[in-house]
Regions:
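The right-handed parallel beta-helix/beta-solenoid scaffold, focusing on the short coil/turn
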Residues: 1-2, 6-19, 24-29, 35-37, ...
Length: 83
């Protein structure tokens, strides 16, 4: 489990069966089978690729841009802002 705190940036992370909670910025993340990336309020995911079995969840006031959602991948939002 990785937590990207406010004002912090994580770049080039690959999630396979792990979880990343984004309160800051996550760039160029790849989410594979069993991986979960959760973007919290005021967090931002940029250039994320979601592969089969992976999940990207964007909570209220979170932001996700330049997302690639491949077949079998899940993109869940509680808000339409920033998608």
């Amino acid at each position: 489990r990785e937590i990207v705190k406010t004002k912090a940036t994580a770049t080039g992370t690959t999630l396979t069966g792990g979880e990343q909670i984004v309160e800051g910025v996550a760039n160029e993340t790849t989410i594979n089978d069993g991986g979960i990336q959760t973007v919290s309020a005021n967090g931002e995911a940029v250039k994320t690729t979601i592969n089969e079995g992976g999940t990207l969840t964007v909570n209220d006031n979170g932001k996700a841009t330049d997302i690639i959602q491949n077949s079998g991948a899940a993109l869940q939002t509680s808000t339409a802002n920033g998608i």
